[in-house]
Amino acid sequence: MSDFWENELVEIAAYYSVAVLCLVLFLTVFELVTAYKNWEEIQKGNLAVAMATGGKILGIANVFQHSISQHNSLLQMIGWGVYGFVMLLISYFIFEFLTPRFKIDQEIENDNRAVGFISFVISVGLSFVVAAGI
């Protein structure tokens, strides 16, 4: 049975499955901390929310890509993926803090595409910084 878990195809499927589950969990956390409902706004055609959410998805996926490539077990991959997510979540709050002239969530909810794009770039860009440390 141990040979089964050492099969490369099984390992890939395991990493993929766990990463997708973590992605869903992390997007749920982001849904809780934002003032708007991501999927409702995307369904209404809100491009700013779509860009911000897409940046979060790419950022989390980038962190997990590095976590998988640098660690030898699912537990290590999950641990570093969670750590990377926390760092991205902190980045989200820093972005909100550094823009006191307006509320990021409100601007994104109002389909301010410039703010949505900057949110996308911050999520993806900082994911490379976080991933490099993993």
Curated annotation (Swiss-Prot):
Its main location: membrane. It is found in: Cell membrane. It is a multi-pass membrane protein. It comes from the Bacteria. InterPro entries: DUF350. GO terms for cellular component: plasma membrane. Coiled coil: none annotated. The chain crosses the membrane at residues 10-30, 48-68, 78-98, 114-134. Keywords: Cell membrane, Membrane, Transmembrane, Transmembrane helix. Belongs to the UPF0719 family. PANTHER family: UPF0719 INNER MEMBRANE PROTEIN YJFL (PTHR40043:SF1). This is UPF0719 transmembrane protein YshE. The gene is yshE.
